[in-house]
């Protein structure tokens, strides 16, 4: 079959185009040549259609040429005939059963192509051969023949298609219906097509149909500026003038933006809402017209009663938009039509119309605003003036205009930037020169410490940097972080800028003030600028690592010198301290020697005094058994009276017993020792108004009741309290018994017949064992109760009296409480009678109970505080009196006694005086302590006094004497050696007495207060 093909198959196409029937008959004898295709895939039949060779087409069709053959565009001969509008060929092809449903590459049928043609005959011919429903066939863009007819503004085609039931509401791929394409035509006859479509369905949904961008047919009509179509569309009541597209723009916005003044007027008149819409930024159509400099359109807006110059969301008015766009005509129109326009009105950020004009660089607008009275230096929120905006953008003419208008060049913004900073940051060398000529310093720093040179170096503006350096800009100024202009140039790798700075004297090794302490070389290394790094190294630049190495070596050298100097100073201090210690040791040894000499001297004087006492006082020697029996009797009497005493006193008595047993074992028995029967009897004491001190008691016990020795009792009635006489009075202690403990009571001797036998003496002694009973009661006014005078027979009488007194006091208190409760009850009943409701009575009862409880609590607190204060005062008075009695006894024994007595009597007196506080200190208790168990107040009293004064002398007497024996054994032994051998044997069980130590111990509990007379006498001694 290939052998039958001619050498040049294009001859068939040429014969078809030229209409050479004879040649065509000859060539188409071969079947392969009937449908031969050229380079476009077209057959001879297609060329016949294109060349309008109907006879040749008939020849080809009779010869059997393919009628539905397609070219490379998938178009058939019918497509070409419909496109050409050749009705004859269309009839021929349709009569030969050509398929009109075939689509080309754009999915267009011959119907779509026929709708493009101005004649409606090809379209009507095709419609005759179509079945119902096939008229709305869509192409690739989802468009029907009606879309194409409306687009090409063929009203007859539209009517014909609508007559054949074409759907007018089918959207294409852009969401547009045929009405959109009909309105989107600038031809005045487009109104016919629009009317044809609207007459078919004049609905509101069709009028306001929005495509996929939200635009209605009115948007397209306004955009094309077709006033006739706009008038036709707006003539229908359902047409919306304020419909928003996806950009929130209405047809009125598009009319103002494009400057269609007539359409604007028409839309304003057809706007039934009476409100001017705004877009997504709050801009009104007036803003759009003002920025486009359409003075006529703006005039139409301003003349309409519903239009106002409202600001947008940023606070900018249409006047500001016009100034920013340089619309001088609009500015003039607005100033003429709106006399109330404020030229200096500010937006949300404080900007004015002059700011906008200066930023845009419109010199004429700036000049016009200044002529109309605009402020030359208004400040926005960033404290920028119009001059700052012009310098930032580099508008030299605007800057000169503003400076001539009086703009200040010395102002700075909120960050401390001057106009020169902004000009340098923009690289505007000419503007920088103008500003420096007007007095701005090139070394002015902002709040971060940056200069205009650093701003220019940051962007690498060489010309600006050179100009600043020519005007004496310092390249070595550092900002607050330590960076210089060289840092910024190296950071961005500007080699030319680095060369310029180093050539102008910039120091290459400035370090940052941050933790990294980077230098310009470090910035170049971090940015991997190799050429710049090499250049810096050649000019002596160092990195922070190299600088740290150099600094480390210098610091090490300095530290070595410092260590040597410090070692020398420490050695010097050590030698000086050694010398000082040696001097202190020598001084201490000298003081110890002097102290030892003084102690030996004092011990010698004490021994001499004791020898005088032993020689002066003559008392028969006591036997060891009788002395021990006497001590046991006193201890037994003490235990009988104080059964419920504290465990501390019992432990102390137990510690004293073994010591006495040891003395009994060590004491040698002598045959010629006098018995205790030969001693004078101990006379009992009775309390009087004039108290007798311990000195008088001791003297009368030694020399008898008839002795003529008398002591001064002038200050006996005085109240000896460490707190002074200003303290409120407390209960006076009352004591009974014969033996007197120092500072616990004041007694006077009562003469009694001296017994002749030892048994009587021991009996009296056992009966008259000192029982110190203290009765301390406080009345309402803290006045002391009258003293109780005991008979001195037995302790039970005292306790019974105190119990009776306590019972009386309790009865009195109960009576007082009953009286108070009765009076309060009477008052309460009166109040209840006055009150009307039961609720108020219940409230009053509750309040009364709470008041009673509070009053009782306050009374108990006051009573406890008063008792504790009185008890503390009594104990302090006892300690004070004890110290005074001991001092006076010592003075009496040293001064008044001059007789010579036996050493045994002296030893006995010393023993009695020494053991008296130990034996009878536990008996000084309140009667309540004997009759009832101790209360909380007593425990608090002892703990409080122990915290104030330490342990009682009676409790720690044994420990003090043991310490004294241990530390001063040599001195005491030296004193006792001076006694006779017989006396030494009898006194071996008696502890050594040091009256000076006793007085010093007493001083610890009396605040070192002594009577003036006693102090003067002691100083004289």
Swiss-Prot record:
Annotated motif D-box 2, positions: 862-870
Parts of the chain that traverse the membrane: none
GO molecular function: calmodulin binding
Repeat is among the record's keywords: yes
Alphabetical keyword list: ANK repeat, Calmodulin-binding, Cytoplasm, Cytoskeleton, Developmental protein, Repeat, Wnt signaling pathway
Ranges spanned by the short sequence motif D-box 1, renumbered to the chain: 483-491
Residues in the signal sequence: none
One family name in Pfam for this protein: Ank
Low complexity composition bias: residue spans: 722-731
Domain IQ: 548-577, 869-898
Biased composition (Polar residues): 759-781, 791-802
UniProt comment concerning the protein's domains: The D-box (destruction box) mediate the interaction with APC proteins, and may act as a recognition signal for degradation via the ubiquitin-proteasome pathway.
Name listed for the protein in its UniProt record: Inversin
Designated gene of the protein: invs
């Amino acid at each position: 079959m290939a052998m039958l093909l001619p050498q040049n198959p294009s001859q068939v196409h040429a014969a078809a185009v030229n209409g050479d029937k004879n040649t065509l008959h000859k060539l188409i004898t071969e079947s392969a040549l009937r449908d031969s295709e050229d380079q476009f895939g077209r057959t001879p039949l297609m060329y016949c259609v294109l060349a309008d060779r109907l006879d040749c087409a008939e020849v080809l069709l009779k010869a059997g040429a393919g009628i539905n053959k397609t070219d490379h565009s998938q178009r058939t001969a019918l497509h070409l005939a419909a496109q050409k509008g050749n009705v004859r060929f269309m009839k021929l092809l349709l009569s030969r059963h050509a398929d009109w449903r075939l689509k080309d590459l754009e999915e267009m049928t011959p119907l779509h192509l026929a709708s493009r043609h101005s004649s409606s005959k090809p379209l009507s011919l095709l419609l005759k051969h179509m079945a119902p429903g096939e008229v709305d066939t869509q192409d690739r863009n989802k468009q029907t023949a009606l879309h194409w007819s409306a687009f090409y503004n063929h009203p007859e085609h539209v009517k014909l298609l609508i007559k054949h039931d074409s759907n007018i509401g089918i959207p294409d791929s852009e969401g547009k219906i045929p009405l959109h394409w009909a309105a989107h035509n600038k031809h005045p006859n487009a109104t016919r097509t629009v009317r044809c479509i609207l007459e078919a369905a004049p609905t509101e949904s069709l009028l306001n149909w929005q495509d996929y961008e939200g635009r209605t047919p009115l948007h397209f009509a306004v955009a094309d500026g077709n006033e006739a179509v706009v008038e036709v569309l707006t003539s229908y009541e359902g047409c919306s003038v304020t419909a928003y597209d996806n950009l929130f723009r209405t047809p009125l916005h598009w009319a103002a933006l494009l400057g269609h003044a007539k359409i604007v007027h028409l839309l304003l008149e057809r706007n039934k809402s009476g409100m001017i819409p705004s877009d997504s930024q709050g801009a009104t159509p007036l803003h759009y017209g003002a920025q486009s400099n359409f003075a006529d359109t703006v005039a139409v807006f301003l003349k309409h009663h519903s239009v106002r110059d409202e600001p947008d969301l940023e606070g900018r008015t249409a006047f500001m938009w016009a100034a920013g766009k340089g619309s001088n005509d609009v500015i003039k129109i607005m100033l003429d039509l709106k006399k109330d326009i404020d030229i200096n009105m500010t937006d949300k950020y404080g900007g004015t119309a002059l700011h906008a004009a200066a930023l845009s660089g419109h010199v004429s607008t700036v000049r016009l605003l200044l002529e109309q009275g605009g402020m030359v230096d208004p400040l926005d929120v960033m404290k920028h003036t119009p001059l700052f905006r012009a310098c930032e953008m580099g508008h030299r003419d605007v800057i000169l205009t503003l400076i001539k208008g009086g703009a200040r060049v010395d102002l700075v913004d909120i960050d401390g930037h001057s106009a020169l900073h902004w000009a340098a940051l923009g690289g505007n060398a000419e503007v920088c020169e103008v500003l420096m000529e007007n007095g701005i310093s090139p070394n002015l720093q902002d709040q971060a410490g940056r200069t205009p040179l650093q701003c220019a170096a940051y962007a690498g503006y060489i010309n600006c940097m050179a100009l600043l350096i020519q005007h004496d800009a310092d390249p070595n100024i550092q900002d607050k972080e330590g960076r210089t202009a060289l840092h910024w140039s190296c950071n961005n790798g500007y080699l030319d800028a680095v060369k310029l700075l180093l050539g102008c004297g910039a120091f290459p090794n400035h370090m940052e003030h941050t933790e990294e302490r980077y230098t310009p070389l470090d910035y170049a290394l971090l940015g991997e600028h190799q050429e710049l790094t090499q250049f810096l190294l050649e000019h002596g630049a160092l990195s922070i690592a190299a600088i740290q190495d150099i600094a480390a070596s210098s610091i090490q050298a300095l530290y070595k010198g410092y260590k040597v100097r410090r070692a020398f100073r420490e050695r010097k201090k050590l030698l000086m301290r050694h010398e000082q210690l040696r001097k202190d040791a020598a001084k201490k040894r000298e003081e110890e020697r002097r102290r030892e000499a003084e102690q030996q001297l004092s011990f010698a004087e004490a021994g001499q005094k004791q020898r005088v006492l032993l020689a002066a006082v003559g008392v028969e020697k006591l036997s060891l058994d009788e002395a021990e029996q006497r001590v046991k009797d006193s201890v037994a009497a003490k235990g009988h009276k104080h059964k419920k005493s504290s465990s501390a006193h019992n432990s102390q008595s137990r510690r004293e017993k073994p010591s006495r047993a040891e003395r009994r074992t060590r004491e040698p028995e002598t045959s010629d020792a006098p018995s205790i029967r030969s001693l004078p009897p101990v006379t009992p004491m009775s309390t009087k108004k004039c108290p007798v001190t311990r000195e008088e008691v001791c003297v009368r016990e030694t020399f008898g009741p008839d002795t003529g020795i008398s002591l001064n009792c002038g200050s006996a009635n005085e109240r000896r309290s460490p707190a002074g006489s200003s303290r409120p009075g407390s209960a006076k202690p009352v004591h009974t018994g014969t033996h007197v403990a120092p500072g616990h009571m004041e007694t006077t001797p009562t003469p009694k017949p001296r017994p002749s036998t030892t048994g009587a003496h021991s009996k009296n002694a056992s009966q008259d064992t000192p029982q110190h009973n203290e009765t301390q009661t406080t009345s309402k006014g803290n006045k002391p109760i009258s003293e109780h005078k005991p008979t001195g027979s037995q302790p039970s009488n005292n306790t019974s009296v105190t119990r009776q007194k306590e019972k009386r006091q309790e009865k009195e208190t109960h009576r007082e409480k009953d009286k108070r409760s009765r009076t309060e009850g009477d008052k309460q009943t009166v109040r209840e009678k006055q009150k009307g409701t039961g609720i108020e009575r219940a409230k009053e009862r509750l309040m009364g109970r709470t008041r009673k409880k509070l009053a009782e609590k306050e009374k108990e607190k006051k009573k406890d505080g008063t008792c504790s204060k009185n008890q503390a005062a009594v104990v302090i008075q006892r300690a004070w009196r004890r110290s005074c009695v001991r001092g006076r006894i010592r003075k009496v024994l040293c001064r008044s006694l001059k007789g010579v007595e036996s050493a045994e009597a002296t030893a006995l007196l010393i023993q009695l005086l020494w053991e008296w506080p130990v034996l009878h200190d536990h008996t000084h208790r309140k009667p309540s302590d004997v009759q009832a168990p101790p209360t909380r107040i007593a425990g608090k009293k002892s703990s409080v006094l122990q915290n104030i004064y330490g342990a009682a002398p009676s409790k720690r007497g044994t420990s003090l004497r043991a310490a004294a024996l241990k530390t001063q054994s040599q001195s005491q032994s030296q004193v006792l050696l001076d006694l006779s051998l017989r006396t030494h044997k009898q006194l071996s069980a008696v502890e050594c007495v040091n009256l000076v130590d006793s007085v010093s111990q007493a001083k610890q509990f009396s605040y070192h207060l002594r009577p003036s007379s006693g102090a003067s006498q002691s100083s004289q001694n």
